[in-house]
């Protein structure tokens, strides 16, 4: 096992590591290429064209298109524009993407070329393309879509599941349309993709829709090039599609016709009005649902699911309804109603109809909109819509499994008979910043080629779907909020959210997802990368995988991976680049010294794997290991002891006298303690010191609960004191963390104390970042780690850094927490490969 440690571990340059994009025969384009780039491409193609057919009035071109071009209406789009231009030939799917052969006059071919890259279907993305002139055939009479080919190269990209498009929504509510109120309505521009694909290339027989033969009207649409459902693989209707069914203590009823479906949902609405809990099978998994305005229903859900405090997501019927429940910016409204349709965490409205049990102790919660026909039928008022799973396990996807596991929670079930092949949970964003990347986003790959720009949302120019010059890397991710990643060619394929790895069910789901993505990519890893922590389930998996496949294993320090994930998504890693400074702030990460890190400033080379820990938060002891993490008062005792905050008022009534005495004795001897520099744990300790809620020995019931409640208290202060955000620290040097605590404790009330603490922390971290950046001679400064989910802390930190003339880089594509860790691990693997190790 190799481990990546600071400075001396990896010092070779980045050359030969990040891809130089040489695999494309002629050119590489991003979706919606600008006209100047397109003209350059046309000249390149004309200059490089060879072979029979040149110099004649009729030419034939063979195109290879790679990217998200399967399951998004790309072949029908090509056929339509080719026929419109009077061209003949064919196109089809294979494991690489889409192949096209087209024949006709040069002017018509030029028109096709222009439209091919500027008028793409809504969900399509071209990552790479090549073109060559070949011999004309002369006998074709039309342009056709041909059956898929099997080449087993694994270059086609999997499309994500997306929300209903505007056209399907209009049809859904149109009483004259055959699909009026049809639960499974979709077209080439929307609906399930990843969740139903069993293998590539993407055709109906290779999806879970294969179990539903098309009726004559659906087949007519499917084969009509002018129809929006031309080659739409999920196409179905009341006559031929999946069927809903109702299950409760009274028995089972199947709903086939529109009338039966309406009766089923009337029954569901009646139960919800009475405070019942429903388990509903959606597109990518099950949801547990109840009336969001009903205290008794919300309390029942929390009790049965054993989720006493963790915030619940709410589904609102419309954007306007959502805006009555939470405060939304115009950008957030558009995001909610986008094809990705994520859950958006936003501040609560000051008054509203929702139960206070939605997000106890917090001032914000997640809001979402209906994104499928099933949800449109169900959601006629605000509903709690939370993952249908047992605590600590992945979301249920199988009917029998759900009936077994959720039977003690739900009063009734709405099921359907379309198999969910790949679980896909809802994505979560804090405003427009990623917190959980899943439905609508995964597995859209992340480009890991360098660029001069610092703002990217996905693969861009100069990327290819595969390069033979780079080793394939499998990164197993972290223990919490797990994703894994496969670096394959120029792209990193980060999986959909899997979740916490503590249960056997989660580990089995992880194994299935790994097998599926490796198979879809036709990828054979040459190196496996894991976290440095020896006790993670993902570390054990990586060890077994490396042994079974006889490949080398690399263990990467947690916070180095966080920092790399930020730089990689901004595509700032490149040969001859300078250095970067990244604050990695979270709850826990196994340090190279055996202690628990989580409040670090790292200085990294952007052209090699060299890094160093420039600064860290002052350490203090965790007393009792994991028990300390769940009991903020224990953290507070350890912090005040180590930081010499000798004030009896600070620690008064933290817990009962017996427990406090026991912890103090452990602090005196050091027995049963471990040192930490974690900012997340400092926030937990501060919550116990500043919020009455956390005095008295209470334990958190979900990760980061005390920290989130501290943020909520500080945010309430900001909402009632708008001028508070305008102030920036006047200190020219970082103040000691002890002074931050003292100043916060001296505040007149808990909300102001929480805000003062946030401001003090932001000031200290910002000064350390700027200081490290000056020493490194760089203006590339960023932040990663789970604490970056604290929106108030990030805004204060951004303002502090901006006051020094520096723009703070934050995550835009992958989550700053452990959901983005696998991307950083994969990039670390590429760095190691660049040192010349034989992989």
Name each model feature, range by range.
Residues 2-8, 12-28, 32, 36-39:
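Low-acidity, Ser/Thr- and Arg-rich intrinsically disordered low-complexity segments
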Residues 37-234, 238-245:
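Intrinsically disordered, low-complexity, mixed-charge
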Residues 146-458, 465-529, 533-548:
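Active-site-adjacent structural elements in enzyme catalytic cores
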Residues 234, 241-243, 478-516, 638-778, ...:
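A contiguous, well-structured pocket-lining segment that forms one wall/lid of small-molecule binding clefts
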Residues 278-292, 383-394, 587-596, 670-691, ...:
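Conserved phosphate/anionic-ligand binding catalytic regions in large, soluble enzymes, centered on
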Residues 531, 549-562, 779-784, 789-791, ...:
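Conserved phosphate-binding/catalytic loops in two-lobed NTP-binding clefts
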Residues 559-572, 579-585, 591, 632-641, ...:
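Glycine-rich phosphate-binding/hydrolytic loop that grips phosphoryl groups
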């Amino acid at each position: 096992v190799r481990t990546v440690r600071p400075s001396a571990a990896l010092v070779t340059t980045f050359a030969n590591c990040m891809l130089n994009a040489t695999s494309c025969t002629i050119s590489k384009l991003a979706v919606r290429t600008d006209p100047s780039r397109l003209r350059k491409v046309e000249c390149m193609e004309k200059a490089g064209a060879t072979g029979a057919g040149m110099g004649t009035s009729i030419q034939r071109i063979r195109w290879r298109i790679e990217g998200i071009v399967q399951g998004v209406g790309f072949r029908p789009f090509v056929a339509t524009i080719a026929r419109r231009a009077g061209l003949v030939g064919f196109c089809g799917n294979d494991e690489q993407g889409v192949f096209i052969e087209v024949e006709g006059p040069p002017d018509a071919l030029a028109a096709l070329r222009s439209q091919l890259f500027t008028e793409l279907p809504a969900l399509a993305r071209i990552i790479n393309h090549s073109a060559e002139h070949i011999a004309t055939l002369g006998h074709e009479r039309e342009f056709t879509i041909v059956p898929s080919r099997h080449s087993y190269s694994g270059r086609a990209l999997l499309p994500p599941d997306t929300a209903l498009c505007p056209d399907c929504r209009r049809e859904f509510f149109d009483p004259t349309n055959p699909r009026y109120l049809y639960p499974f309505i979709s077209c080439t521009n929307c609906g399930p993709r990843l969740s139903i694909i069993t293998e590539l290339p993407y055709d109906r027989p290779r999806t879970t829709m294969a179990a539903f033969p098309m009726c004559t009207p659906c087949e007519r649409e499917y084969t009509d090039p002018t129809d929006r459902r031309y080659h739409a693989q999920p196409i179905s209707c009341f006559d031929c599609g999946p069927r809903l069914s109702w299950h409760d203590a009274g028995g089972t009823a199947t709903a086939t016709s529109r009338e039966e479906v309406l009766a089923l949902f009337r029954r569901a609405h009646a139960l919800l009005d009475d405070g019942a809990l429903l388990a509903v099978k959606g597109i990518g998994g099950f949801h547990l649902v109840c009336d969001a305005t009903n205290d008794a229903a919300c309390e029942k859900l929390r009790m049965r699911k054993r989720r006493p405090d963790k915030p619940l997501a709410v589904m609102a019927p419309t954007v306007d309804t959502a805006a009555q429940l939470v405060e939304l910016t115009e950008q957030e409204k558009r995001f909610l109603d986008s094809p990705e349709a994520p859950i958006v965490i936003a501040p609560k409205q000051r008054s509203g109809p929702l139960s206070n049990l939605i997000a106890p102790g917090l001032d914000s919660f997640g809001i979402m909109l209906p994104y499928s026909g099933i949800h449109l039928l169900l959601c006629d008022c605000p509903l709690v819509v939370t993952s249908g799973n047992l605590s600590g396990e992945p979301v249920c996807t199988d009917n029998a499994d759900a009936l077994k596991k959720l039977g003690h929670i739900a009063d009734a079930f709405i099921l359907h008979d379309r198999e969910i092949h790949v679980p896909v949970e809802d994505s979560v964003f804090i405003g427009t910043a990623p917190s959980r990347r899943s439905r609508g986003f995964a597995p859209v790959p992340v480009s890991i080629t360098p660029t001069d720009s610092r703002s990217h949302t996905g693969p861009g120019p100069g990327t290819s779907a595969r390069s033979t010059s780079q080793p394939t890397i499998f990164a197993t991710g972290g223990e919490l909020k797990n994703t894994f990643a496969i670096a394959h060619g120029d792209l990193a394929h980060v999986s959909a959210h899997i979740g916490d790895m503590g249960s056997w069910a989660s580990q089995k789901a992880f194994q299935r997802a790994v097998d599926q993505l490796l198979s879809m990519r036709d990828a054979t890893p040459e190196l496996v990368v894991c976290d440095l922590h020896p006790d993670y389930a993902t570390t054990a998996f990586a060890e077994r995988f490396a042994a079974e496949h006889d490949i080398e294993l690399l263990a990467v320090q947690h916070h180095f991976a966080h920092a790399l994930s930020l730089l990689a998504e901004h595509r700032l890693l490149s040969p001859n680049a300078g250095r970067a400074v990244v604050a990695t702030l979270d709850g826990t990460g196994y340090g190279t010294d055996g202690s628990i890190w989580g409040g670090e400033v790292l200085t990294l080379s952007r052209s090699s794997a060299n890094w160093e820990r420039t600064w860290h938060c002052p350490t203090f002891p965790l007393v009792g290991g994991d028990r300390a993490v769940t009991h903020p008062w224990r953290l507070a005792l350890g912090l005040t002891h180590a930081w010499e905050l000798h004030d009896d008022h600070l620690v008064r009534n933290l817990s009962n006298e017996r427990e406090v005495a026991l912890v103090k004795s452990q602090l005196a001897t050091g027995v049963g303690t471990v040192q930490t520099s974690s900012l997340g744990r400092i926030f937990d300790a501060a919550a116990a010191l500043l919020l009455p809620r956390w005095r008295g020995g209470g334990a958190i019931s979900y990760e980061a609960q005390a920290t989130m409640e501290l943020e909520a208290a500080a945010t309430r202060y900001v909402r009632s004191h708008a001028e508070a955000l305008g102030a920036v620290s006047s200190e020219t040097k970082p103040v000691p963390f002890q002074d931050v605590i003292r100043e916060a404790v001296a505040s007149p009330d808990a909300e102001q104390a929480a805000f003062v603490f946030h401001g003090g922390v932001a000031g200290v971290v910002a000064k350390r970042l700027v200081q490290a950046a000056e020493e490194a001679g760089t203006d590339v400064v960023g932040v990663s780690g789970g604490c970056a989910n604290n929106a108030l802390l990030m805004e204060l930190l951004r303002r502090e850094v901006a006051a020094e003339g520096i723009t703070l880089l934050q995550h835009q594509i992958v989550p700053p927490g452990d959901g983005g860790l696998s991307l950083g691990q994969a990039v670390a693997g590429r760095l190691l490969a660049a040192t010349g190790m034989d992989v």
